[in-house]
A protein has these predicted regions:
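Intein/HINT protein-splicing elements and their conserved insertion hotspots or analogous self-processing inserts
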Residues: 1-83, 97-199, 207
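Short hydrophobic/aromatic beta-strand micro-patches
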Residues: 90-94
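Short, intrinsically disordered, charge-balanced linker/junction segments flanking boundaries
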Residues: 206-212
Length: 212
């Protein structure tokens, strides 16, 4: 795990999917929530564990903050709760009762962990203990690796300029008035089975998530 790695250890437990059918069932339940419009945002729990997923959900906007309560979780070890990398997903939803009904119907386990909080603060509570994390400072630490790699690719001056300003660019989307959000607008069909005759390659400039 990432947690074990920063402690210079390998670790003794490996994240695993113990029930493939349950995993598929959970995935399909999440897809249904997305399709029916109940999911506002989401993040997988993987490298770095739940704490990384929570922080990365906050990193996208300077106005975000979370108040999280883990008191309802059976696990008592806060380190395991925060850093375990077993498969899971965090979702921000808009109707707790309807989401709970859908997950209950699918037989998928879930917990309601918290709500939006004060901008720039991630507050975590577990069995009488409270943890207060400063999102902007942790965002800088999180982005620093990208900055150090960017220095090798773009040079010190440009990389430093980006590092100083990356969090000052608010997340905004601007669509043309004619944009409908539908594939059919561009002559695309998600159910197409015949080749289109168009060949394309997507080349990533910045590499991938294996930089650790």
């Amino acid at each position: 795990s990432s947690f074990a790695q920063v402690l210079n250890r390998v670790g003794k437990e490996t994240p695993d999917v113990k029930d493939a059918d349950y995993f598929v069932n959970a995935f399909m339940a999440i897809q249904r929530l997305v399709e029916e419009g109940y999911v506002l945002a989401g993040h997988d729990i993987s490298a770095g564990g739940m704490i990384t997923a929570l922080l990365e959900m906050c990193f996208a906007d300077n106005r975000l903050g979370l108040d999280i309560d883990f008191s309802y979780l059976a696990e008592k070890d806060i380190v395991k709760i925060l850093f375990a990398e077993n498969p899971g997903v965090l979702v921000q939803i808009k109707d707790c009762k309807k989401v709970a009904a859908i997950l209950d119907e699918a037989g998928v386990a879930y917990n309601f962990l918290g709500r939006l909080g004060k901008a720039g603060k991630l507050n975590i509570k577990k069995d009488g203990k409270n943890f207060h994390l400063d999102i902007p400072s942790l965002r800088d630490l999180w982005f620093k690796t990208s900055y150090l790699l960017d220095r090798r690719q773009s040079g010190n001056e440009l990389a430093l300029e980006r590092y100083k300003n990356y969090k000052n660019h608010d997340l905004k989307y601007k669509f043309a008035p004619s944009f409908s959000g539908k594939l059919s607008q561009y002559g695309l069909d998600v159910n197409r089975v015949k080749p289109s005759g168009i060949k394309a390659a997507v080349i990533r400039e910045k590499g991938c998530q294996c930089e650790r």
